[in-house]
Amino acid sequence: MTYPDDYSTDVQKNEMDLKEFKEKAYLAELESKVLRLELKNKDITRENVQIKKENEILKRELDKLRIPPLILGTVLDRVNERKAVVKSSTGPNFLVNLSQFVEPDDIVPGARVCLNQQTLAVVEVLPKEKDYRAMAMELEEKPDILFGDIGGLNNQIRDIKEVVELPLKNPELFEKVGIVPPKGVLLYGPPGTGKTLLAKAVARETNASFVRVVGSELVKKFIGEGAKLVRDVFKLAKEKSPCIIFIDEIDAVASKRTESLTGGDREVQRTLMQLLAEMDGFDSRGDVKIIAATNRPDILDPAILRPGRFDRIIEIAAPDEDGRLEIFKIHTDKMNIKSVDLREIAKMAENMVGADIKAVCTEAGMFAIREGREYVTTKDFKEALLKVTGKKEKSEEGIAHLTTMYG
């Protein structure tokens, strides 16, 4: 059987096409394998680099662990460019050499240094010592209280802004007028009137650092410890300036000095004297301001009340009717109230302070929840007033009873 010539040619052409297709497919497969290998190689290279980095870090950590500890010392005097007299932490004084890595200008009396165990040479200069308790008093996050969240204290807010905010933000105004800006402000008044709230609002409204101290934290057991903490607090404030120091319950450390003293009373008086010295010491036009709060101004030492220490003494009294109404509006702003005449409630809340009004609003909400409602009515507020007033009267009766018993 014979085939046409063109048939043979077609077969040969198809065979060549098939062969060419197989070659292309094989090449494509090879290229794909090469690409996968290249990607795998890159991954291995990256892992290798990462392992080398980790290995270097571990080696450095191991070297640190192998280095013997250094001895702490305090510089007493620098003899020349390469020698100094140092008091070691173990007790004796040494004349030691300075390492080439230490700048001679950093070796000053009182500087903390590290000494080599073998040669006692100065190998490092440490930063100034700081009391961790003073560092912990700085607020990293600003409080969330604004002046608009405080009701019934418009005059007091104006006064504290003039004393604290204005000298920090516009000190040139005082220079133009030719007066010295106030150094500090003392807030006094019954508990719950908003003294601490004012300090929080100042911290929020200014860009200054804020150091909060409770007076009892400055009272320590051992001699000189409280005074050292006071020094460290003011040193921290200067380093963080502009800064505001807020001393809450200052009567714990600044009560009147008497002649009959126990050991604890003497230490409190030493702390007070250090506080007085620090308040006199910092620059009045500097960026450090002090705010203090107390509900017992009658027991404060006269020395701390004189002008130059607390230049402005602001009374935070119980609010009047308009002030109570303003406070009720602030606390009920996010409450679901229905047909409530806040003016009437404010009239009924006579002699109440801000903390009492907040308690009334909370109790009114609790009465509504107890009855299964999602809104608060006038009845809830009236019942809350009776409940909070009853608690307050019982508390005052208890205090009067204790006063009668113990004088």
From Swiss-Prot:
Where does the UniProt annotation locate this protein? Cytoplasm
SMART domains associated with the record: AAA
Binding annotation for ATP: 192-197, 331
Please provide the record's keywords in A-Z order.
Answer: ATP-binding, Chaperone, Coiled coil, Cytoplasm, Nucleotide-binding, Proteasome
A biological process (GO) of this protein is: protein unfolding
The record's InterPro entries line, in alphabetical order, gives:
26S_Proteasome_ATPase, AAA+_ATPase, AAA_lid_3, ATPase_AAA_core, ATPase_AAA_CS, NA-bd_OB-fold, Nucleotidase_PAN, P-loop_NTPase
Q: Where is this region: Docks into pockets in the proteasome alpha-ring to cause gate opening?
A: 405-407
* Coiled coil location: 22-67
Q: Which domain of life is it from?
A: Archaea
Family in the record: Belongs to the AAA ATPase family.
Supply the HAMAP family for this chain: PAN
Q: What is this protein called?
A: Proteasome-activating nucleotidase
Q: What is the lineage of its organism?
A: Archaea, Methanobacteriati, Methanobacteriota, Methanomada group, Methanococci
